[in-house]
Design a protein with these regions (language model features):
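A short acidic, often aromatic-flanked loop/helix-cap motif at beta-alpha or helix-coil junctions
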Residues: 25-29, 87-89, 103-104
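Residues that form or immediately flank small-molecule/cofactor binding pockets and catalytic motifs
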Residues: 23-25, 84-86, 152
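Active-site beta-strand->loop->alpha-helix modules in alpha/beta enzyme cores, enriched
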Residues: 1-78, 127, 131-142
Length: 155
């Protein structure tokens, strides 16, 4: 919890906008229904117009539950699936967000807050920047972030 709080602070997310639960790590499949109920309640309370979830092909068991139960809970809401290349067999790269240098610096700083993951190659600054360059190249800009468009609702 300490790491996510620090990362959110770097991103400018107010502590009162961060909602954390105590589901045990790597055991989300056992709590699938409870997680769905939390999300349904959040949908009712917040009524978001966009929800960003792990992409539908993320193989990490906890991410997979969040992605699929999130789809069920927010099915009447626009949804994007974020990219975690080390966990995804595939991702449909259909939504791009152009990033500027300050955005990328902020992302690098936020990822550095996850000190317990610092030994992993994907948590390093070089990987984060390289992926942003790759995604930017795909759409003709310097940096970008990709999302899978799970559901897009225009009203």
């Amino acid at each position: 919890k300490k790491e996510v709080k620090a990362a959110c602070a770097k991103l400018g997310i107010a502590p009162n906008n961060l909602i954390l639960h105590d589901f045990p790590v790597r055991r989300f499949p056992e709590f699938r229904q409870d997680i769905l109920e939390v999300m349904v309640q959040l949908n009712s309370t917040l009524a978001p117009n966009l929800v960003i979830l792990p992409n539908q092909n993320d193989t990490h068991q906890d991410h997979n539950v969040i992605s699929h139960e999130g789809f069920r809970a927010f099915k009447k809401t626009s949804m994007l699936g974020y990219e975690l290349p080390w966990n995804s067999l595939t991702i449909t790269t259909t939504g791009f967000v152009v990033l500027e240098e300050p955005h990328l610096d902020l992302k690098v700083d936020a990822v550095k807050c996850y000190e317990s993951q610092s030994f992993r190659g994907y948590a390093g600054e070089e990987f984060v920047r390289s992926l942003a360059i790759t995604r930017g190249t795909q759409i003709g800009c310097r940096y970008a972030e990709v999302f899978e468009v799970t559901r897009w609702i225009i009203s």
